[in-house]
């Protein structure tokens, strides 16, 4: 989870659009990424796309150039869940560099698991990355769609999070968010904050 940092050059008023997705459909691949090079092929545009039809959203941000040499921009007021970025621009714009910027709540490492099996070690690394992708002041369900603090999602991952990271302050704050959802009968909402 994070955003793209894009370095461009072009005329004043020219526009740049940055779109994000987890996995583009075959029809959305750019010419230099052939479908045969992907480990997973996706032909169903409803499953993966720069446009998620199931919830009618696009993860995107844009920029209008000042036209004064090389300009660098990044969307710092929202984060996206993505593995792929598509950058399109008006004529006359040169895209010089695109860089992924990961963002998450700063939680210190509390533990680490390493063994002699490279596959298990890679699985552990991916699990840690997935956890960090969902730490954004609350434990979220996903970094690209709802971005909500669903209690069941947190229940399913809290032990893994605690083994890997110092979660005391993070979870204490989120439990306060959860307490804030309590109604007059004592019931709690399934999403916190809400």
Residue positions per predicted region:
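Extracellular/oxidizing-compartment recognition motifs
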Residues: 1-145, 152-153, 169-174, 178, ...
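Well-ordered alpha-helical scaffold segments within catalytic/enzyme domains
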Residues: 87, 156-167
């Amino acid at each position: 989870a994070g955003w793209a940092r894009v370095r461009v050059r072009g005329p004043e008023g020219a526009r740049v659009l940055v779109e994000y997705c987890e996995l583009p459909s075959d029809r959305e691949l750019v010419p230099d990424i052939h479908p045969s090079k992907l480990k997973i092929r996706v032909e169903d545009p409803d499953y993966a796309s720069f446009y998620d039809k199931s919830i009618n959203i696009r993860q995107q941000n844009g920029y209008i150039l000042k036209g004064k040499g090389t300009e660098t921009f990044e969307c710092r007021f929202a984060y996206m869940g993505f593995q792929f970025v598509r950058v399109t621009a008006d004529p006359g714009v040169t895209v010089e560099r695109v860089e992924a910027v990961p963002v998450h709540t700063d939680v210190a490492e509390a533990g680490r698991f390493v063994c002699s099996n490279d596959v298990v070690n890679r699985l552990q690394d991916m699990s840690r990355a997935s956890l960090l992708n969902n730490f954004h002041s609350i434990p979220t369900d996903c970094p690209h769609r709802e971005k909500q603090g669903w209690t069941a999602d947190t229940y399913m991952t809290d032990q893994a999070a605690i083994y890997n990271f110092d979660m005391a302050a993070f979870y204490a704050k989120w439990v306060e968010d959860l307490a804030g959802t309590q109604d007059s009968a004592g019931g709690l909402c399934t999403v916190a904050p809400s």
